[in-house]
């Protein structure tokens, strides 16, 4: 047993496995070997004595005429034979025998060592799998080792694991070559015949959230919380923040002095424009903030039962806007000169605002009031944007 213990300690040191795991693996392999090589019906136990593992066979003491002595001799011993070894033994006592590997054939020993190696490798993989499962949605960094013909990028992570960044999880316009360093978020851990495969992404909103947590210490310290995040990767993103500390401005903390924090993140994401928004639990205010830089006059929230929607509406509405079988809809009133800002280039602004807030947004435009010197009745300039919304919710 000493040689086995020395071998396991050596492997454990090389593989950086905990001693408890090693002990469990050894015991399992010894028990398996005993059942396969000695007697599958016997009862075995592995115990630790003087920092060495001992393989023990257990037998129960029975009356001399008990039928189980004939039917199952590997598990039982007669009282008369037991007393020859220990005069004080009684019925139902258990006797134990220490078994030595030296009495076993070389083939059995080789199979034991092979099984130990396999089980240790499996235990190591299980340990790494669990460790990476805990790191899901966190940023990993590695070096490109291969870009295949489908533009899937294979990355060496921590000098022993392989990650893959598929083309569809790559920001549009990005290209990588062997030797490049890459940051990406871990989205899935897979077991393959060659070992663990780490699936990575640079397009998921979780990538932006993870980078913000790395760059903004107030988020890691839980003084600021990311509430929602919406992205069109490589183009534009909107992130809403809430401060749990009244002394900390969540937007100022996220942006940093002269934009140093948010610019660092933008550069990592291929110059993606990132809008930082303060979260509000009042949907009307939240939607108004999300549609910036457009100035909004008012927001009307509607929750429409699905059964009241037409077939065409059901097909066009995205599932993210359906909550408790109701369509979450926001009717936004704004001046006609503000509509293009609210929609944004290619519809990006309104798309991100909808993704961020969870509301299907529709616009109602109001003609702009032009200055007219001949107008007899001078009108007060209406409030717009958040100022207008907040005035509606004041007591």
Curated annotation (Swiss-Prot):
Assigned protein family: Belongs to the NusA family.
Do you know which HAMAP family this protein is assigned to?
A: NusA_B
Where would you find the membrane-spanning parts of this chain? none
The primary site where this protein sits is cytoplasm
| Domain annotation S1 motif: ranges | 137-201
Do you know which InterPro entries this protein is assigned to?
Answer: KH_dom-like_a/b (IPR015946), KH_dom_NusA-like (IPR025249), KH_sf_prok-type (IPR009019), NA-bd_OB-fold (IPR012340), NusA_bac (IPR030842), NusA_N_sf (IPR036555), S1_domain (IPR003029), TF_NusA_N (IPR013735)
Q: Where is it located?
A: Cytoplasm
Q: What's the name of the protein?
A: Transcription termination/antitermination protein NusA
Naturally occurring in which organism (per UniProt): Helicobacter pylori (strain J99 / ATCC 700824) (Campylobacter pylori J99)
Q: Pfam families this protein is in?
A: KH_5, KH_NusA_C, NusA_N
| Every KH domain range | 243-291, 331-378
Keywords, ordered alphabetically: Cytoplasm, Repeat, RNA-binding, Transcription, Transcription antitermination, Transcription regulation, Transcription termination
GO cellular component, as recorded: cytosol
Gene name per UniProt? nusA
The record's note on quaternary structure and interaction partners says: Monomer. Binds directly to the core enzyme of the DNA-dependent RNA polymerase and to nascent RNA.
- Which GO BP terms, alphabetically? DNA-templated transcription termination; transcription antitermination
Q: What does this protein do?
A: Participates in both transcription termination and antitermination.
- Which N-terminal residues, if any, form the signal peptide? none
SUPFAM superfamilies attached to this UniProt entry = Nucleic acid-binding proteins, Prokaryotic type KH domain (KH-domain type II), Transcription factor NusA, N-terminal domain
């Amino acid at each position: 047993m000493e040689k086995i213990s020395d071998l396991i300690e050596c492997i454990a040191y090389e593989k950086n496995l905990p001693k408890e795991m090693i002990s469990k693996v050894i015991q399992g392999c010894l028990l398996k070997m005993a059942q396969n090589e000695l007697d599958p019906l016997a009862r075995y136990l592995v115990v630790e004595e003087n920092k060495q593992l001992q393989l023990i066979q257990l037998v129960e003491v029975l009356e001399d005429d008990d039928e189980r002595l004939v039917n199952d001799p590997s598990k039982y011993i007669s009282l008369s034979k037991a007393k020859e070894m220990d005069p004080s033994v009684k019925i139902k006592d258990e006797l134990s025998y220490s078994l030595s590997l030296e009495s076993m054939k070389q083939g059995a020993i080789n199979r034991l060592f092979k099984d130990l190696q396999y089980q240790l490798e499996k235990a190591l993989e299980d340990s790494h799998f669990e460790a990476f499962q805990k790191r899901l949605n966190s940023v990993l960094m590695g070096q490109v080792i291969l870009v295949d013909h489908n533009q899937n990028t294979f990355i060496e992570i921590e000098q022993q694991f392989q990650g893959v960044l598929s083309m569809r999880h790559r920001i549009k316009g990005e290209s990588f070559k062997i030797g490049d360093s890459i940051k990406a978020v871990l989205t899935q851990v897979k077991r393959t015949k060659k070992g663990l495969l780490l699936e990575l992404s640079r397009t998921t909103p979780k990538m932006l959230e993870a980078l913000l947590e790395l760059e903004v210490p107030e988020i890691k310290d839980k003084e600021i919380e990311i509430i929602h995040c919406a992205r069109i990767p490589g183009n534009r993103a909107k992130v809403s923040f809430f401060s749990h500390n009244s002394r900390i401005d969540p937007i100022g903390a996220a942006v940093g002095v002269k934009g140093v924090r948010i610019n660092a993140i933008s550069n990592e994401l291929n110059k993606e424009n990132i809008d930082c928004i303060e979260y509000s639990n009042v949907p009307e205010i939240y939607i108004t903030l999300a549609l910036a830089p457009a100035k909004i006059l008012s927001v009307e929230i509607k929750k429409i039962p699905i059964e009241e929607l037409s077939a065409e509406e059901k097909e066009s509405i995205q599932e993210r806007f359906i909550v408790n079988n109701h369509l979450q809809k926001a009717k936004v009133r704004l001046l006609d000169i503000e509509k293009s800002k609210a929609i944004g280039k290619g519809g990006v602004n309104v798309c991100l605002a909808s993704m961020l807030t969870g509301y299907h947004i529709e616009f109602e435009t109001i003609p702009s009031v032009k200055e007219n010197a001949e107008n007899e009745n001078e009108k007060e300039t209406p409030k717009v944007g958040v100022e207008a919304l907040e005035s509606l919710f004041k007591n």
